[in-house]
Every structure is written in C-alpha cells, then in structure tokens.
Amino acid sequence: MKTLADALKEFEVLSFEIDEQALAFDVDNIEMVIEKSDITPVPKSRHFVEGVINLRGRIIPVVNLAKILGISFDEQKMKSIIVARTKDVEVGFLVDRVLGVLRITENQLDLTNVSDKFGKKSKGLVKTDGRLIIYLDIDKIIEEITVKEGV
C-alpha cells in the first residue's frame, strides 16, 4: 500500500521521440497532442519556427523542438504536435511521435546535468524500463524561445 509520502514523490510526464531519442515534458503544461496538420509558414521568423496552425480559432506558433535542442531530425518523420502552455504563452512543439504518459517516481530521476548540450533546457534523466529519457524543462524552453523576439 502506498503511503502519502510515496504518492507525493510521483509525477507524470509525456514521453515522445525525435530521431529515436526519447524525451519528456511534465504533463501539467500539456494541453493536447494533435497530428501534424497544415502549417502556414511565417516569413522572416526565427530558424526554429515552422509556422503557425489554426487550432479551433486560436493561432498557435509551431516550433521544431529538434532545432531548439540542437539534435538531428528527419522532417518526414515529424508527425505530431504537442500543444503546450506556460503562463500566457501557447506553443506547438513538432516531434516525431508521442509515446505516452508515464508515471515517474523521484528515485527514477537522475538530476545530474544531461550534457552541456541541453543546459538549462533539461531537468535530468528519467530511468524507466531499461531506457533513458531526457526530461526537459518546458518552462525554460518556452522562456528561451520567447524572451528575445517572441515566437
């Protein structure tokens, strides 16, 4: 039987892949996951901005998460958009595919820095089912992409 302390040490993440690299976001910031649809390009936008989508009357910028993280990707494999919100900013992250929601305990989380490559964009590594998942800090990523010029 779980104690209250055990329950407090659990949290959920949405896991997904880019170029066979497993990554995850906190589910608290995820609004929905949709299939990649028609993305309207925006002239003179930043290199990681793929364009915008109209989602039920809301215009949402879509960014290529692989470009933000500096990892390889195959544009043909990018089939899903993770729509996320922090504070008043709503962004769609283009990824290969969503794997699902995982319930994680604190003892599965390695808070050591993943690498200099991800810096503050990563909260650490999640160890689950013999696989390592890079646990991303969605707040830091959205802050980084909106702080200078906006998406």
UniProtKB/Swiss-Prot annotation:
Every CheW-like domain range: 10-147
Gene Ontology terms, MF aspect: protein domain specific binding
Domain of life: Bacteria
Main location: cytoplasm
A GO CC term assigned to this protein in UniProt: cytosol
Record-linked InterPro entries: CheW, CheW-like_dom_sf, CheW-lke_dom
Cytoplasm recorded as keyword: yes
UniProt name for this protein: Chemotaxis protein CheW
Organism: Thermotoga maritima (strain ATCC 43589 / DSM 3109 / JCM 10099 / NBRC 100826 / MSB8)
Gene: cheW
